[in-house]
From Swiss-Prot:
Residues 394-493 are cytoplasmic. It comes from Homo sapiens. It is a single-pass type I membrane protein. The keyword Glycoprotein applies. Residues 431-442 have a biased composition (Basic and acidic residues). Residues 1-27 form the signal peptide. This is Amphoterin-induced protein 1. PROSITE patterns: IG_LIKE, LRR. Homodimer, and heterodimer with AMIGO2 and AMIGO3. Interacts with KCNB1. LRR repeats lie at residues 62-83, 87-108, 111-132, 135-156, 159-179, 186-206. PANTHER family: AMPHOTERIN-INDUCED PROTEIN, AMPHOTERIN-INDUCED PROTEIN 1. It holds the Pfam family LRR_1. Glycans are attached at residues 72, 264, 315, 349, 360.
Length: 493
């Protein structure tokens, strides 16, 4: 007879068997999921230096770091991985032959924080290329062949902190990347060294806060030499910014196809850099920022009299705003002097001093300035109109001048005479003979009544009015005479 078996014992073994089978399945799945060309260690997959032409398939979904560097990858398509890798935070694709990246290639890795695309063959960065990487913090693109960067290539990357674009062929400075509060509000490092930048937006760079300029690397570029460039980098040197202090010898510019160090432009006769003071007028409202090299620092302001500036205005016109700036309301002359900002951070402390000069007068309002400008403009327009009228609308007397009528002898001028074109007589001829020529002597009469010789007044003198002569005789002051002589000497005609 067979012994009787209690079915309750079998039911007690089922949970243990199920747990054992689950552990075996999980262990087997982990072993099977690791690609043959990769080395797997927990959630790290290293597939580097395997000469892979494509990304391995069946990547584990729990992968946190994927190293595909030093392979033969040439294109990164949208379907490069069929598995959505939501836990992947680091992707290394350096030292491949990548020349194309799909705009949807990063959709399967939305939580990526570190992306290395350096040492490839990328030539352009198209719009919205990295828009799916909204939490990316570090992006390496150095040592490619990038010539063009689309203005929208880095849209929707509000968490990006470090961007490496050195050793490319970029010729346009991407100003949209460094404007405070623009596309990349947390960007603290932008490496544009060893490119083909010639011109920089110098006025815009001067306005950038120190924490951005501290990580803006521009060395090894063929910049155009000028004094404004020298002033810019001299200010950065004065502030001890890392982007200048770490690469002083590599900051050069081009002039006449020759390289010159930016800090040695004596041939341009650039003036020595001096830190400028803040200037204000009576009654102005002024904000002075504590321009630190790091963000998120605690700031304390001290007045020229070594008194701490409070957050709220108590006595006086100065206070500290919420962002640590010095706020002046209704500036007074006694507010002038040197103010000191003490900035304290977790790993870094900084001390800044700024000088304020207050002019003892007020500026004109905007309406006065506009009125003055309007008056000047109207005056200039009227002047131009008058000049045009004078040049083109002045009446010409010759147009309306009729046939000249002979005037009376009373209207003739008696202060000129005509030199006759009759041939000269022989002065050596004797006797009273005239040799067929009339000889007449004309005396110049005074120009007006009461004038004598040389314009001297002779009271009581009057001018005789000559009688009418024959019709064919030429008048003494004919306007058509060849010449007129103003002299008291008798002229033989």
């Amino acid at each position: 007879m067979h012994p009787h078996r209690d079915p309750r014992g079998l039911w007690l073994l089922l949970p243990s068997l199920s747990l054992l089978l689950f552990e075996v399945a999980r262990a087997g799945r982990a072993v099977v999921s690791c690609p043959a060309a990769c080395l797997c260690a927990s959630n790290i997959l290293s597939c580097s230096k395997q000469q892979l032409p494509n990304v391995p398939h069946s990547l584990p979904s729990y992968t946190a770091l994927l190293d595909l560097s030093h392979n033969n990858l040439s294109r990164l398509r949208a379907e490069w991985t069929p598995t959505r890798l939501t836990q992947l935070h680091s992707l290394l694709l350096s030292h491949n032959h990548l020349n194309f990246i799909s705009s949807e290639a990063f959709s399967p890795v939305p939580n990526l924080r570190y992306l290395d695309l350096s040492s490839n063959q990328l030539r352009t960065l198209d719009e919205f290329l990295f828009s799916d990487l909204q939490v990316l913090e570090v992006l390496l693109l150095y040592n490619n062949h990038i010539m063009a960067v689309d203005r929208c290539a880095f849209d929707d990357m509000a968490q990006l902190q470090k961007l490496y674009l050195s050793q490319n062929q970029i010729s346009r400075f991407p100003l949209e990347l460094v404007k405070e509060g623009a596309k990349l509000p947390k960007l603290t490092l932008l490496d544009l060294s060893s490119n083909k930048l010639k011109n920089l937006p110098l006025p815009d760079l001067q306005k950038l806060p120190a924490w951005i300029k501290n990580g803006l690397y521009l060395h090894n570029n063929p910049l155009n030499c000028d004094c404004e460039l020298y002033q810019l980098f001299s200010h950065w040197q004065y502030r001890q910014l890392s982007s200048v202090m770490d690469f002083q010898e590599d900051l050069y510019c081009m002039n006449s196809k020759k390289l010159h160090n930016v800090f040695n432009l004596s041939f341009l006769n650039c003036g020595e850099y001096k830190e400028r003071a803040w200037e204000a007028h009576l009654g102005d409202t002024l904000i002075i920022k504590c321009d630190t090299k790091q963000q998120g620092m605690t700031k304390v302001w001290v007045t020229p009299s070594n008194e701490r500036v409070l957050d709220e205005v108590t006595n006086g016109t100065v206070s500290v705003s919420k962002d640590g700036s010095l706020l002046f309301q209704q500036v007074q002359v006694e507010d002038g002097g040197v103010y000191t900002c003490y900035a304290m951070g977790e790993t870094f402390n900084e001390t800044l001093s700024v000088e304020l000069k207050v002019h003892n007068f007020t500026l004109h309002g905007h309406h006065d300035t506009l009125n003055t400008a309007y008056t000047t403009l109207v005056g200039c327009i009227l002047s131009v109109v008058l000049v045009l009228i004078y040049l083109y609308l002045t009446p010409c007397r010759c147009w309306c001048r009729g046939v000249e009528k002979p005037s009376s002898h009373q209207g003739d001028s008696l202060s000129s005479s005509m030199l006759s074109t009759t041939p000269n007589h022989d002065p050596m001829a004797g006797g009273d003979k005239d040799d067929g020529f009339d000889r007449r002597v004309a005396f110049l009469e005074p120009a007006g009544p009461g004038q004598g010789q040389n314009g001297k007044l002779k009271p009581g003198n009057t001018l005789p009015v000559p009688e009418a002569t024959g019709k064919g005789q030429r008048r003494m002051s004919d306007p058509e005479s060849v010449s007129s002589v103003f002299s008291d000497t008798p002229i033989v005609v």
